[in-house]
C-alpha cells in the first residue's frame, strides 16, 4: 500500500512545469509504481490555450475546479468543462483547452507516464518507459 501527501511532492521531480508555461502538474502515481496507469493533479492557467494530442496514451480527466472550453479539433465540437465534468480521450483525439479560470483536474493515463514527459511541437507526450 502507498499513502502519500501532496506536500511530499513540493520541490521534487514529481512537480512538473511545462516548457510552454501553460500548466503545472503533480505526478502522484507513475510508471515506476507498476500499477498500469498514472495519476496526476494538473493546473492549467487562466487565459492560456493548450493544444494536445495523446497519440500514445488514453487520458481520462475530471475537473475539480475552474472553467475551460474543450474543443475536439477533429470534429470542431466544443464542450464547456466545469467542476464535476469529466472527459475521456479514448480515441486519441487532438484537442485544445482554452482556460477561462485556473483549471484544476485529476488526470489518469494509460499507459502510465514516467513523470518526465512534456508536450512536443504536436502536443504529444512521447512514449517513455521506466528503466528497470
UniProtKB/Swiss-Prot annotation:
<comment type="pathway">
    <text>Amine and polyamine biosynthesis; ectoine biosynthesis; L-ectoine from L-aspartate 4-semialdehyde: step 3/3.</text>
</comment>
<comment type="function">
    <text>Catalyzes the circularization of gamma-N-acetyl-alpha,gamma-diaminobutyric acid (ADABA) to ectoine (1,4,5,6-tetrahydro-2-methyl-4-pyrimidine carboxylic acid), which is an excellent osmoprotectant.</text>
</comment>
<comment type="similarity">
    <text>Belongs to the ectoine synthase family.</text>
</comment>
<dbReference type="GO" id="GO:0019491">
    <property type="term" value="P:ectoine biosynthetic process"/>
</dbReference>
<protein>
    <recommendedName>
        <fullName>L-ectoine synthase</fullName>
        <ecNumber>4.2.1.108</ecNumber>
    </recommendedName>
</protein>
<dbReference type="InterPro" id="IPR014710">
    <property type="entry name" value="RmlC-like_jellyroll"/>
</dbReference>
<keyword id="KW-0456">Lyase</keyword>
<dbReference type="InterPro" id="IPR011051">
    <property type="entry name" value="RmlC_Cupin_sf"/>
</dbReference>
<dbReference type="GO" id="GO:0033990">
    <property type="term" value="F:ectoine synthase activity"/>
</dbReference>
<dbReference type="Pfam" id="PF06339">
    <property type="entry name" value="Ectoine_synth"/>
</dbReference>
<dbReference type="InterPro" id="IPR010462">
    <property type="entry name" value="Ectoine_synth"/>
</dbReference>
Amino acid at each position: 500500500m502507498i499513502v502519500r501527501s501532496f506536500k511530499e511532492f513540493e520541490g521534487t521531480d514529481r512537480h512538473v512545469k511545462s516548457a510552454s508555461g501553460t500548466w503545472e502538474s503533480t505526478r502522484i502515481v507513475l510508471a515506476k509504481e507498476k500499477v498500469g496507469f498514472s495519476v496526476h493533479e494538473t493546473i492549467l492557467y487562466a487565459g492560456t490555450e493548450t493544444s494536445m494530442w495523446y497519440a500514445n496514451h488514453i487520458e481520462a480527466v475530471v475537473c475539480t475546479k475552474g472553467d475551460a472550453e474543450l474543443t475536439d479539433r477533429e470534429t470542431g465540437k466544443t464542450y464547456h468543462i466545469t467542476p464535476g465534468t469529466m472527459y475521456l480521450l479514448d480515441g486519441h483525439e487532438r484537442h485544445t483547452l482554452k482556460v477561462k479560470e485556473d483549471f484544476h483536474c485529476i488526470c489518469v493515463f494509460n499507459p502510465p507516464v514516467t513523470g518526465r514527459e512534456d508536450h512536443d511541437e504536436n502536443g504529444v507526450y512521447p512514449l517513455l518507459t521506466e528503466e528497470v
